[in-house]
Amino acid sequence: MVMGSHLCSKLQALSSKIKQASVSGKWREVVSGYSEIQRAGVQFNDPFVFPIVFKACAKLSWLFQGRCIQASLLKRGFESFVSVGNSIADFYMKCGDLCSGLREFDCMNSRDSVSWNVIVFGLLDYGFEEEGLWWFSKLRVWGFEPNTSTLVLVIHACRSLWFDGEKIHGYVIRSGFCGISSVQNSILCMYADSDSLSARKLFDEMSERDVISWSVVIRSYVQSKEPVVGLKLFKEMVHEAKTEPDCVTVTSVLKACTVMEDIDVGRSVHGFSIRRGFDLADVFVCNSLIDMYSKGFDVDSAFRVFDETTCRNIVSWNSILAGFVHNQRYDEALEMFHLMVQEAVEVDEVTVVSLLRVCKFFEQPLPCKSIHGVIIRRGYESNEVALSSLIDAYTSCSLVDDAGTVLDSMTYKDVVSCSTMISGLAHAGRSDEAISIFCHMRDTPNAITVISLLNACSVSADLRTSKWAHGIAIRRSLAINDISVGTSIVDAYAKCGAIEMARRTFDQITEKNIISWTVIISAYAINGLPDKALALFDEMKQKGYTPNAVTYLAALSACNHGGLVKKGLMIFKSMVEEDHKPSLQHYSCIVDMLSRAGEIDTAVELIKNLPEDVKAGASAWGAILSGCRNRFKKLIITSEVVAEVLELEPLCSSGYLLASSTFAAEKSWEDVAMMRRLVKERKVRVVAGYSMVREGNLAKRFLAGDKLSQSDSELNDVVQSLHRCMKLDDTAGPIN
């Protein structure tokens, strides 16, 4: 009798210990306490302890131990208690064994509101939104009510599945849950994803707003491209409502600064976050700061934040890497990647995209192939952004066929990947293939796709295809409303020689910018109408448009092709006076203009006196060499220029061919032989020039020295006739 009393006291002590451990969250002690009871070998009949034990197993994810405890209870009939059955079902649902949880629910003789909430919550918590909402509807049919936690998840499921938010909102009001802060904030989140006006209306109606409410409505405005309103709300939150923001709020505000591209306001928010202690302690704030500074073209400040932060993750690394790429500091981007490797940071798809942009800039084929291997090994082949970036990098590295292989391997060819491939093929001069890809696209083309198509039309210089592309742009309402598309149409017509159609399209663009003006000026220049090009240049300035470096280059090209040396030098002088720093292209254009006019000595003098930060390229020296050939300058000057050209581009065939032609014009046959010998010794790959003519729907090439073309006597007669015409002007005199 004494023994029985002692054992009873011990069981009561263990029971109290289990309950106390659960209050303190010491779940291992709960399970070990229950194990002691089992080792005592006596029947334990306190049904209130079993739910605590199953809760502990769920917290620890101890599925096997929970099953064993359930088996012992099954023998003793404790599962008939609703509270015990609920705890077992909840244990299985939280351990991820949803089937066992549902089976336990089906086996329960009686169920209460908790039973239904356990099932609905478990399904929704594991992402089974549709199944969870189906069980939620059954719960209501049987007359039970959800608890707050379940209702919050139901609202989240409606938000994920884009169900009618107003219906669930109505249910919340009818059920009397609208006064609960967590439920109100969940409804607010649901509206914030799609309707900032409804979110603001609900926010204004809320009697009590906490930091979550403010953060959600601020984020809603930022996502809706209304960052200014979001910033105003942030000021109201801090100064008027006296609500202390948290890291989530600051992250949304920094995103607003990024969208606005207002780095000054961003710095103020950075200072605010420092005073609140958010800048280094929270990884989301740090990453938002890095992104804000990078996109605000202050990557040095972005790197300082990255360097000082104590809580980096892969997003931090990707943000600073993308920042260097965005600011075109590709060498530093590579250094960051090497640092990632040293720190053993695992790369992801975002890292791959940034690295491919670096490869695109350096035009390095081997790194592209290496990254392609990484994409395959890591299983990123389903990532459309990564594959589109790979296609873009391959085409930039002249690996168009490899890019085509990547496109063919994609199960779903989205509009971005197709647009990238079309642009790459156009850049490679393969316009027919580019147009073919456009015709086989399944998605509706966007403005970028149409621009890529128009670029292909520019390359083919086929007027009929350009008109067809123009028609597509009109049907998509892009020809007039989208300035980039309209400008591309102007360029396509100009390249086809249809200058009147180009001008008509230009006049139809409702809101012109400096790019559209530059394109139409260039259009007249390349079509042999320099006077009209320069008249447009003057008209543009009169209308208040400030020419940029490319506009000046178009005007200088017009002077160059028209032989207007004085006008060209005047434009160049005005460019310098207006604080536009001339680039190598501008100097090369002036050199070419002087060389064509026979002022070889002046051109050489200009090259030798270029600014320190501008180094003459092969194109500038090549222009002088071409001038030497046409003007039969002294062999000393020719030899000097040839040496410069071959030093700058020792493996480019055009320099050797031009030098050989120049020496031949001067009848220096020894030098001609030397050029041919150098080509063989240096293994220079000679790329044959070609002309294109459209026959039917195909563009055909005629290569220089093509024996098949020369065997066609009729075609050969036409070519010889054209050759004679090119050597004569209207007065039958030689062209200089």
From Swiss-Prot:
One Pfam entry name: PPR_2
Family the entry assigns: Belongs to the PPR family. PCMP-E subfamily.
PPR repeats (start-end): 10-44, 46-80, 81-111, 112-146, 147-179, 180-209, 210-240, 246-280, 282-312, 313-347, 348-382, 383-413, 414-444, 446-480, 482-512, 513-547, 548-582, 583-613
Underlying gene: PCMP-E77
GO biological process: RNA modification
Alphabetized UniProt keyword annotations: Repeat
UniProt protein name: Pentatricopeptide repeat-containing protein At2g17210
PANTHER family xref list: PENTACOTRIPEPTIDE-REPEAT REGION OF PRORP DOMAIN-CONTAINING PROTEIN, PENTATRICOPEPTIDE REPEAT-CONTAINING PROTEIN
GO molecular function per UniProt: RNA binding
Type E motif: region residues: 620-696
